[in-house]
């Protein structure tokens, strides 16, 4: 006789929690929220309709109902809060959570939502029923709480060996699957007629990671609980996050990457996810194509809404209404794509930071290696063997080649090539040489440009006679000046002002044997006239007392003679009246050393530098 009153929210709630939905449909959820706010008894009727949907045996319906209740709690104010905290709704939640046939994910979702609502209703003591129900559920189902973190135990060699075996087994299975991929389409065609049950929970294919599972066979895991790091190096995540597995670090801890961050996480907080199949990848690609295909409709809707008059009734305009509903349907997919590509953006950002750091480290190492090259003899010309007329040292201008092989003496100054005025500076300003330049390397300090007037040398410098005053010899005197000058300096260490006895020994100086020194002393005791006369085979070299009265010749410094036949005529006169000898005797091939014997006059000894 009396019929039950029809609930106006049954259809709207059933539509928002349809079991055939692949995800939460926010269009239908917002419609329920708007309807609850528009009606006086909307909150009570909506909660009554949701209690009916919680009794449904499909896990998807139960999950969608919990999401609808959470959306109402966040958008509809105190009215819906009072109904959600009522005894009828909390008892329905406890019955569903304590049912042994309820899926584990649904139980976890109930506990999670009740915790959120307890915190949301904490300011109002009238809603204490929700807190009581939450504490009761925690007591009756302790396994729903986030587990305690396992200890960090080092991985043993046996664990490493087991991980390697699992990896090899996974590779073998992958190769076997690829080998049997050809008959696979026929099997799929034969089984396509069988109906497929799509009412299972979305996480039915996922399973918790067992303690002995290695990271070699798992690439992705999903978080079951929120995890807050308590030590440095741990990865923070929220429930539902998908973590990319990198490697095993401890016995029950893996290393993973999430939103650009890398760290370790406990295995009892996550569940293993299988790798996406070809069908799943195609489904994701189709979803992205649907979202991008609605871009034109969204732009068209914005254009119509911006150009229409404010007096236009939007509800009467069928075009605007159709565009609105078609674009609103892509909102859940759009939110999912935003989360997906946000995670990829974080991963690429982290990869870019690692690449930049690696590039900076490489460049710093490269600059450090280039800043310390191999040691080289900068400024020191390569010394040719004694007695061999080698090429000119590095840093000295190359003298002109001699055209006549029978010509013994150096050409006149006008025959030599003067260096250009803008020629680069040579190494060092006042260098002391361990041996004189060869015949093809004139001293640049004594070679002024052609045609330049004679310039008086500086007082602190030693006056250098022209090379025309040198007579070729085949004997090198023993030098007592042991310390060679450093390159690139402007101070000349005079052996006269600083005798060898007052200077520290040069570590690189060559010690002359005693027999050779005795031989040199015997040669120095010979008569003076014998040293002044040219040798029948090897002419002597040096100055004579009569050279001091001769007028100076041209100031150019021609190349020194090398090993050539004996002279056919007398050498040119000696220029200048300087009493200071040159520290650069000529070096020629052949024979042993023969020192110059000084004359018994008041003139200073030219060979004083070599004693």
UniProtKB/Swiss-Prot annotation:
In the record, biological process GO terms are:
protein transport to vacuole involved in ubiquitin-dependent protein catabolic process via the multivesicular body sorting pathway
Locate the compositionally biased regions of type Polar residues: 196-211, 480-492, 596-611
One example of the protein's molecular function in GO is:
phosphatidylinositol binding
UniProt keyword annotations, A-Z: Endosome, Membrane, Protein transport, SH3 domain, Transport
Mind telling me which PROSITE patterns this protein's record contains?
SH3 (PS50002), VHS (PS50179)
Chain ranges of the VHS domain: 16-145
Q: Where is the composition biased (Pro residues)?
A: 558-575
What InterPro entries would the database entry show?
ENTH_VHS, GAT_dom, SH3-like_dom_sf, SH3_domain, STAM, VHS_dom
Instruction: Provide the SH3 domain boundaries.
Output: 216-275
Q: Which GO terms describe its cellular component?
A: endosome membrane; ESCRT-0 complex
- Which segments does the entry list as coiled coil? none
Bias (Low complexity) ranges: 182-195, 388-397, 452-472, 509-534
Q: Which SMART domains match?
A: SH3 (SM00326), VHS (SM00288)
Region (Disordered) residue ranges read 140-163, 182-211, 373-611
Q: Which residues form the UIM domain?
A: 162-181
Q: How does it sit in the membrane?
A: Peripheral membrane protein
Q: Please give the function described in this protein's UniProt entry.
A: Component of the ESCRT-0 complex which is the sorting receptor for ubiquitinated cargo proteins at the multivesicular body (MVB).
How would you summarize the oligomeric state and partners of this protein? Component of the ESCRT-0 complex composed of HSE1 and VPS27.
What name does UniProt use for this protein?
Answer: Class E vacuolar protein-sorting machinery protein hse1
Organism of origin: Aspergillus niger (strain ATCC MYA-4892 / CBS 513.88 / FGSC A1513)
Gene that encodes it: hse1
């Amino acid at each position: 006789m009396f019929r039950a009153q029809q609930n106006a929210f049954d259809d709207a709630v059933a539509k928002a929690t349809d079991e055939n939905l692949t995800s939460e449909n926010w269009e239908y959820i917002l419609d329920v929220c708007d309807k609850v706010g528009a009606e006086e008894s909307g909150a009570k009727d909506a909660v009554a309709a949701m209690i009916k949907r919680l009794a449904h045996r499909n896990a998807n319906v139960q999950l969608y109902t919990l999401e609808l209740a959470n959306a109402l709690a966040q958008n509809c104010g105190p009215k819906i809060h009072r109904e959600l905290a009522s005894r009828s709704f909390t008892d329905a939640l406890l019955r569903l959570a304590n049912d042994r046939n309820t899926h584990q994910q649904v139980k976890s979702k109930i506990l999670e939502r009740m915790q959120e609502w307890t915190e949301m209703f904490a300011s109002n003591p009238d809603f204490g029923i929700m807190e009581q129900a939450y504490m009761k559920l925690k007591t009756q189902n302790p396994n729903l709480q986030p587990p305690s973190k396992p200890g960090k135990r080092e991985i043993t060699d046996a664990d490493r060996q087991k991980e390697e075996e699992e990896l090899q087994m996974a590779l073998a299975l992958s190769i076997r699957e690829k080998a049997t991929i050809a008959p696979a389409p026929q099997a799929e065609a034969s089984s396509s007629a069988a109906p497929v049950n799509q009412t299972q929970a979305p996480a039915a294919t996922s399973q918790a990671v067992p303690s002995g599972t290695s990271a070699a066979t798992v690439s992705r895991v999903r978080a079951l609980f929120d995890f807050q790091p308590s030590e440095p190096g741990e990865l923070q995540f929220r429930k539902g996050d998908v973590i990319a597995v990198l490697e095993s670090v401890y016995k029950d801890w893996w290393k993973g990457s999430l939103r650009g961050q890398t760290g370790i996480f406990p295995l009892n907080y996550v569940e293993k996810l299988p790798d996406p199949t070809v069908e799943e990848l195609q489904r994701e690609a189709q979803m992205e194509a649907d979202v991008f295909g609605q871009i034109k409709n969204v732009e068209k809707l914005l254009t119509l809404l911006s150009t229409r008059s404010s007096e236009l009734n939007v509800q009467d305009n069928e075009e605007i209404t159709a565009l609105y509903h078609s674009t609103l349907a892509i909102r859940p997919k759009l939110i999912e794509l935003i989360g997906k590509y946000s995670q990829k953006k974080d991963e690429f950002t982290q990869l870019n930071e690692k690449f930049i750091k690696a590039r900076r480290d490489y460049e710093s190492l490269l600059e450090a290696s280039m800043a310390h090259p191999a040691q080289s003899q900068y400024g020191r010309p390569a010394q040719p063997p004694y007695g061999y007329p080698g090429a000119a040292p590095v840093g000295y201008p190359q003298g002109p080649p001699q055209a006549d092989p029978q010509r013994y003496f150096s050409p006149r100054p006008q025959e030599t090539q003067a260096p250009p005025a803008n020629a680069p500076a040579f190494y060092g300003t006042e260098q002391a040489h361990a041996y004189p330049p060869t015949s093809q390397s004139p001293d640049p300090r004594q070679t002024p440009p052609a045609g330049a007037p004679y310039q008086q040398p500086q007082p602190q410098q030693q006056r250098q006679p022209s090379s025309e005053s040198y007579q070729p010899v085949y004997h090198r005197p023993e030098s007592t000046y042991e310390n060679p000058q450093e390159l690139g300096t402007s101070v000349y260490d005079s052996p006269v002002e600083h005798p060898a006895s007052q200077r520290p020994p040069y570590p690189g100086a060559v010690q002359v044997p005693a027999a050779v020194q005795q031989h040199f002393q015997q040669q120095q005791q010979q008569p003076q006239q014998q040293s002044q006369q040219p040798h029948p085979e090897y002419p002597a070299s040096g100055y004579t007392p009569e050279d001091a009265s001769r007028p100076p010749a041209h100031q150019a410094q021609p190349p020194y003679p090398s090993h050539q036949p004996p002279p056919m005529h007398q050498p040119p006169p000696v220029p200048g009246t300087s009493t200071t000898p040159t520290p650069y005797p000529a070096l020629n091939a052949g024979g042993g050393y023969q020192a110059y014997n000084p004359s018994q006059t008041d003139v200073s000894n030219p060979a004083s530098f070599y004693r």
